[in-house]
């Protein structure tokens, strides 16, 4: 587990790690799957709920008005070269899993991975589905599939990543400008789709740069109190894995099983999703297969 030739302070040290047997979804949770859950339970996600001004720790007059409206973070390409992520992320009121690009954009596509969810939303779905969010070690084991670590960008047939000069030019060699429907690219040796690219995937672990060398058997990462993210120093963030369609050689070379970052558990984004792990064999039929069988009964 881990890698030391790309972002060693984030991903090292490399060490032998053991995890108990588990099952994992073959692809990211889709909009169709999440819609079935939300419709049957009347669930409302964090991005759709009224905003509590107290969460900002400021007086209401100091908070930009748009941040007091329900919404989420959407990738918005800038019109000039930039290496500052604040130049291409925009908080869009009305953006949610149903409307990934905002209220004036298209509806979510059924077979694309669900995005714009907070940790609370993912856990609610997981409980309903009889699963759980995988640990970082489980996720990395499933993604690595026994292959030797690589540092180069995947080709356009194996993962949805950014081809071109990020964030200005996307050559779309892989056929997609943004998120792709699940299963469009070759599976890894474990038969799992989109473990690299497409959307970042959330894991259970809290984030700190680097790994604990002593964490070898079913590691769980640091405690909430010991979590530290240099990009969000006052917030315990969760580890996300695998990179997304925004990862490019000139900016974010995190299209690898060992890649990791911290993400705010309370705020969704248009390039972050998840899949579930299970301690016993689940029903891995696709939503389409399950709904067809149900209608035939």
List where the protein language model places each region:
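Short capping motifs at secondary-structure boundaries
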Residues: 22, 37-46, 129-130, 281-282
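A short N-terminal beta-strand-loop micro-motif at the entrance of redox/enzyme domains
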Residues: 16-21
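Short beta-strand segments
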Residues: 13-15, 238
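C-terminal, low-complexity/hydrophilic appendages and adjacent surface loops
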Residues: 8-12
């Amino acid at each position: 587990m881990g890698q030391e030739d790309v972002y060693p302070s984030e991903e090292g040290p490399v060490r032998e790690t053991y995890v108990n047997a588990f099952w994992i979804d073959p692809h990211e949770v889709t909009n169709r799957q999440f819609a079935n859950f939300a419709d049957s339970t009347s669930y409302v996600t964090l991005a759709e709920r009224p905003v509590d001004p107290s969460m900002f720790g400021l007086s209401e007059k100091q908070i930009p008005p748009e941040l007091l409206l329900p919404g989420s973070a959407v990738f918005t390409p800038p019109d000039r070269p930039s290496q500052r992520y604040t130049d291409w992320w925009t908080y869009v009121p009305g953006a949610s899993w149903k409307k990934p690009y905002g209220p004036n954009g298209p509806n979510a596509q059924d077979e694309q991975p669900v995005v714009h969810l907070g940790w609370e939303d993912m856990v609610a779905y997981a409980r309903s589905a009889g699963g759980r969010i995988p640990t970082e070690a489980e996720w990395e084991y499933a993604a690595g599939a026994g292959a030797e670590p690589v540092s180069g960008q995947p080709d356009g047939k194996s993962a949805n990543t950014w081809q071109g000069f990020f964030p200005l030019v996307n050559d779309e060699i892989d056929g997609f400008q943004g998120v792709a429907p699940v299963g469009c690219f070759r599976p890894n040796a474990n038969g799992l789709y989109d473990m690299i690219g497409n959307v970042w995937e959330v894991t259970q672990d809290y984030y700190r740069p680097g790994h604990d060398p002593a964490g070898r058997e079913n590691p769980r990462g640091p405690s909430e109190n010991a979590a530290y993210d240099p990009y969000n120093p006052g917030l315990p963030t969760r580890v996300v894995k695998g990179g997304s369609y925004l990862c490019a050689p000139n900016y974010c070379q995190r299209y690898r099983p060992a890649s990791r970052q911290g993400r705010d558990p309370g705020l969704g984004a248009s390039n972050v999703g998840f899949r579930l792990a299970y301690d016993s064999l689940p029903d891995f039929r696709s939503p389409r297969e399950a709904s067809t069988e149900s209608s035939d009964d």
